[in-house]
A protein has these predicted regions:
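A conserved beta-strand-loop-helix scaffold within acyl/acetyltransferase catalytic domains
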Residues: 26-110, 174-330
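Hydrophobic alpha-helix feature that most strongly marks membrane-spanning transmembrane helices
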Residues: 260, 264-267, 286-289, 303, ...
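Short, Lys/Arg-enriched N-terminal segments with co-localized hydrophobic residues
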Residues: 13-24
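Active-site/acyl-donor-binding loops of N-acyltransferases
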Residues: 22-33, 96-97, 138, 180-182, ...
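Acyl-donor binding region in acyl/amide transferases
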Residues: 75-78, 83-84, 89, 96-198, ...
Length: 414
């Protein structure tokens, strides 16, 4: 059976009862030149080495170094690296968290999950070791671009074996890969599933393509109804003063409180994965600098009511985090006002895409966005429990449990 790299996997690998044996067999049949290590974080890897695997990304080495210095509550960060002959050939950020298995339950099902957690916490909450980061829009699992297809397979096999051995040493039973982008998951899905990982649909990322020459051109691209709604929201917003800044000196606490207020008013609750360190905005803006980070601030009568953190790349603007005061922000339609300012910012920078995260899907689709799929992989290190996980996986996909995504799927299928 061939995987996406054109390499041949052992016959019957999907029927492996012990993924650890699969990894050892795969690794034994390949080159033994790979060395796996677990640095204290991405920041402990040489910047040039990391940038070679992930060139021109705002969520790059400087970003990870900043967030690793002050992780959000409940998380511990490391990295995992594979080298050969002293050269980094594969790497990924690594996180540790006590994960609630009921996290996908949202909307009307959320009280059931909370009841289970209160009643049987040891059944619901488990230590997890995962590739990726709660603070990145996708899992940065990367490979040296000079590797051949078969060498990538070898490097990935070594990385997975190193991850399993680390989990065994630390007594962690659940392994995960958070938010692997669809285009990056396809070539390695066979290897991951052969190693015992199951996959479920994660929360997709909203992306607005920008083949437009102006703000007016963008608005004309919307449907008549959505165009009318957007124009009305902008017209009735009132006297909103907008400012784009690259320094938040003196505003750090206020900006963090805007984010926290928005999180508290959300209809959804993804627990630890939504939390930020109080130092996040200060540290990240300072680390990335004005070439990589900016904030849109919205004030009414001098009072700061909303903020939007943007990351800057050559062809993409990442609308990273949004915060707003309630109810004043809604009264002034600040979601729409700040959205348009973000689109203007992206157009002014010549960006081809405006990426706006994993929230407010229905509204963002009305504003022209599409949804890029993301995948979550997981494996229990006990084979019997892992088989149960594999069977249960389709039932707990995030796109089924998230009420907004479920409604979008229903409308599409209907």
């Amino acid at each position: 059976m061939a995987d996406g790299w054109g390499a041949t996997l052992p016959q019957g690998y999907l029927a492996q009862t012990d993924p650890r044996q699969f990894l050892m067999n795969m690794f034994a049949s390949k080159s033994q030149d790979f060395l796996v290590s677990t640095p204290a974080g991405v920041g402990a890897i040489a910047e040039a080495d990391w940038q070679r695997l992930f060139p021109d990304e705002a969520e790059g080495w400087a970003y990870y170094r900043a967030v690793e210095a002050a992780p959000p509550p409940g998380f511990r960060f490391e990295a995992i690296a594979v080298s050969r002959g002293g050269r980094l050939v594969a790497a990924a950020p690594l996180f540790h968290v006590t994960y609630r298995l009921d996290t996908p339950l949202q909307g009307r099902l959320r009280p059931i999950g909370d009841w289970l957690h209160r009643t049987v916490p040891r059944v619901v909450a488990h230590p997890v070791m995962g590739l990726g980061s709660p603070l990145a829009d996708r899992c940065h699992l990367g490979f040296d671009p000079d590797l051949s297809h078969s060498e990538r397979e070898q490097a990935l096999t070594a990385l997975l074996q190193g991850l399993d051995e680390k989990a065994a040493r630390e007594g962690v039973r659940i392994l995960a890969i958070k938010d692997l982008a669809d285009r990056e998951a396809q070539p390695i899905d066979g290897v991951l599933q052969g190693a015992g990982f199951s996959r479920i649909a994660g929360l997709p990322v909203s992306v607005l393509d920008l083949p437009f020459t102006s703000e007016a051109d963008y608005i004309r691209s919307l449907s008549a109804n959505n165009r009318s709604v957007l124009r009305r929201k902008l017209k009735t917003a009132g006297p909103v003063a907008l400012e784009t800044v690259t320094s938040i000196a003196g505003l750090e606490d206020e900006i963090y409180s805007l984010y926290e207020e928005t999180r508290a008013n959300s209809r959804f609750d993804y627990g630890d994965f939504e939390q930020l360190s109080p130092r996040y905005f200060r540290d990240v803006v300072a680390a990335l600098g004005p070439e990589r980070a900016a904030l849109i601030l919205a004030r009414v009568d001098g009072r700061l009511l909303a903020m939007k953190l943007l990351f800057i790349e050559k062809d993409r603007i990442i609308d990273k985090f949004w915060g707003m005061r309630y109810p004043a922000g809604r009264e002034h339609n600040l979601f729409f006002v700040a959205w348009m300012e973000g689109v203007r910012f992206a157009l002014a920078h010549g960006a081809r895409r405006y990426q706006s995260g994993q929230t407010a899907y229905a509204q963002k689709m009305k504003l022209g966005s599409r949804l890029d799929p993301m995948w979550v992989y997981f494996r229990h290190r006990w084979p019997v429990v892992n088989r149960i996980f594999r069977r249960a996986a389709p039932l707990i996909a995030f796109d089924k449990m998230d009420p907004e995504l479920a409604d979008i799927r229903k409308r599409r299928s209907g």
